[in-house]
Curated annotation (Swiss-Prot):
The modification N5-methylglutamine is found at residue 251. It comes from Chlamydia trachomatis serovar D (strain ATCC VR-885 / DSM 19411 / UW-3/Cx). The gene for this protein contains a UGA in-frame termination codon after Leu-23; a naturally occurring frameshift enables complete translation of RF-2. This provides a mechanism for the protein to regulate its own production. The keyword Protein biosynthesis applies. Methylated by PrmC. Methylation increases the termination efficiency of RF2. The gene is prfB. The lineage of its organism: Bacteria, Pseudomonadati, Chlamydiota, Chlamydiia, Chlamydiales. Keywords: Cytoplasm, Methylation, Protein biosynthesis. This is Peptide chain release factor 2. It is found in: Cytoplasm.
Length: 369
């Protein structure tokens, strides 16, 4: 037992040193935090509400990251001190507590090692994530709602802010379409691995004959981009429609045509937003999404061109089936791109195992995304 702990401690110390040296840079983050906090107390800081909001979010994120790093560093030091104390290290109750500390530290190191795989130009950005029901009717709409729950729990575990941008409920149950905005560092870097078709196999609760059904839902992920990235959208290339926002009812459902849908003719891209209170705000949000979708399409075309010359490397097939979720006759979740699989489907649907699938994807595909 003691030898096992010693080996695990050695790996933790190596991981902590590598994280500090090549990724985290706590000194740099502390300096950035001081500079931003100085800006935040200057007169007129809130004159530009958008800029001030972004700086405030960055300050909160830096504080959280530094807190997490210091917590990890302190826990590793405590483990090291414990193992050097021969009397304490023989105590069985203390060993149980030590195991919990090891699991916590190892999980955190693994999370930060995953960040080292996120080197794309937009990986640090927030993102939009859309889920659309495919073939399967009500069953597929229910599948969208199940995936939504999984992604919301997963995003919450990363401390990202979740905004519902657009939603269309199913006629009987579930959701036909939903778009989320995940706000936080590396949201796009992680979530981009989820783009593609997700296949569900289960005995449908909507079938009185209890037959097994196969349903599909597609997931699209595209990064939020700032004004520094130029995307040309000519007025004559778009059509703007307004409509009454939908919802489950109650005081927050608009009674005016405040929801906005924009169609971009050259690409066929359609975006919509009903989250904001006014038509002007929804229109602005739609334009931001449209810019992001068009830019993502340009990136995809560039990657597809690069894939022509990658005969010895795996290709990225946009919109293809990426993962199977089998509930009956056995339980299995398998990624068809990487071969990574787990049998605990409930933990997967609770968002607890998604990071492992994403890391496997990034290891195999990270350099070409």
């Amino acid at each position: 037992m003691h030898e096992n702990f010693d080996k695990r401690l050695e790996l933790l110390l190596e991981g902590l040193a590598l994280t500090r040296r090549s990724l985290f840079d706590p000194e740099g983050k502390e300096n950035e935090l001081k500079e931003l906090e100085q800006q935040a107390v200057q007169d007129g800081f809130w004159d530009d509400v958008v800029r001030a909001g972004k700086i405030s979010e960055r300050i909160a994120r830096l504080k959280q990251q530094l807190s997490e790093f210091n917590e990890l560093k302190n826990k590793v030091s405590a483990i090291q001190f414990f193992l050097e104390d021969e009397e304490s290290s023989k105590d069985l109750e203390m060993q149980k507590e030590l195991e919990k500390e090891f699991v916590f530290c190892e999980k955190k190191i693994t999370e930060w090692e995953t960040l080292r795989l996120l080197s794309g130009e937009l990986d640090r950005n927030s993102c939009f994530l859309s889920i659309n029901a495919g073939a399967g009717g009500t069953e597929s709409c229910d599948w969208v709602e199940m995936l939504l729950r999984m992604y919301m729990r997963w995003a919450s575990s990363h401390s990202w802010r979740i905004e519902v941008i657009d939603r269309l409920d199913g006629e009987v149950a579930g959701i036909k379409h939903i778009t989320l905005k995940l706000v936080g560092e590396y949201a796009y870097g992680y979530a981009k691995a989820e783009s593609g078709v997700h296949r569900l196999v289960r005995i449908s609760p909507f079938d009185s004959n209890a037959k097994r059904h196969t349903s599909f839902a597609s997931v699209e992920v595209f990064p939020e981009i700032d004004d520094k990235i130029e995307v040309e959208i000519r007025p004559g290339d778009i059509r703007i429609d307004t409509y009454r926002s939908s919802g489950a009812g109650g005081q927050h459902v608009n009674v005016t045509d405040s929801a906005v849908r924009i169609t971009h003719f050259p690409t066929g891209i359609v975006v919509s937003c009903q989250n904001e209170r006014s038509q002007i705000q929804n229109r602005e949000a739609c334009m931001n999404m449209l810019r992001a979708r068009i830019y993502q399409k340009l990136l995809q075309e560039r990657l597809e061109k690069q894939n022509i010359d990658r005969k010895n490397k795996k290709e990225i097939s946009w919109g293809s089936q990426i993962r199977n979720y089998v509930f009956q006759p056995y339980t299995l979740v398998k990624d068809v791109r990487t071969g990574y699989e787990v049998g605990n489907i409930q933990a997967m649907m609770d968002g607890e195992l998604l990071d492992a699938f994403i890391k496997a994807y990034l290891v195999d595909y990270g350099e070409i995304t």
